[in-house]
């Protein structure tokens, strides 16, 4: 079904990145050019990877922003990054990452810079996109609640080494390493239940 990426040429990697494999960064706002409007950047991104007109790319960008439940996608496309909230910029980044229905999405702390309410919305939207497009997601997070909610499989790392791995239920309910046990014990309790 798959093939090794280890022997890919630079050109093969270029064709994969942004289309079949995509990335959401911790601060998507930092990856956006501050002196270019969102629409200009989004249209360029789409046109770089496809043979569509700028008008078609604009429509596709608006459609993806609407899927991320951003109000008034046309207005967002006409905005500069600094005119959007952190949550809105993060949604723009996720929309861009999902534009080509990637097979694999890498998400590096995609919610850590956001308030709790926005975090929950972003996580739900990522899972909806996963379900809609059949995208596999590898998420790097320090948030045990996000990991417990999103993951089918968990890998716990300490100092760059794997110390626990398995299904979500195996790792959450039967951790094997002391490190994982300490992480889980540090999760706050509410009415006698761990808050994950």
Identify the meaning behind each predicted range:
Residues 4-22, 40, 48, 170-175:
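ABC ATPase NBD coupling module
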Residues 56-75, 184-185:
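Conserved ABC ATPase "signature" region
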Residues 99-103:
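A short, proline-enriched helix->beta-strand linker immediately N-terminal to the Walker B motif
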Residues 120-133, 145:
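Helical segment within the ABC ATPase nucleotide-binding domain
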Residues 147-149:
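A short, surface-exposed alpha-helical micro-motif characterized by mixed small hydrophobic
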Residues 165-166:
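ABC ATPase "signature
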């Amino acid at each position: 079904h798959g093939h090794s990426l280890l022997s890919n040429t630079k050109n093969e990697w270029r064709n994969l990145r942004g289309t079949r494999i995509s990335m959401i960064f911790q601060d998507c706002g930092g990856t956006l050019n501050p002196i270019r409007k969102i629409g200009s950047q989004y249209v360029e991104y789409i046109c770089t990877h496809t043979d569509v007109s700028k008008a078609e790319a604009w429509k596709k960008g608006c459609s993806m922003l609407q899927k991320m439940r951003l109000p008034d996608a046309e207005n967002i496309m006409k905005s500069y990054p600094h005119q959007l909230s952190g949550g809105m910029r993060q949604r723009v980044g996720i929309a861009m990452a999902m534009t080509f229905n990637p097979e694999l999405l890498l998400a590096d702390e995609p919610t850590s810079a956001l308030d709790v309410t926005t975090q929950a919305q972003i996580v739900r939207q990522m899972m909806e996109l996963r379900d809609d497009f059949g995208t596999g997601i590898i998420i790097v997070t320090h948030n045990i609640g996000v990991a417990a909610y999103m993951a089918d499989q968990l890998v716990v790392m300490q100092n760059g080494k794997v110390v626990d791995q398995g299904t979500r239920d195996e790792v959450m309910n039967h951790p094997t390493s002391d490190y994982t046990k300490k992480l889980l014990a540090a999760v706050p309790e509410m009415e006698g239940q761990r808050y994950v």
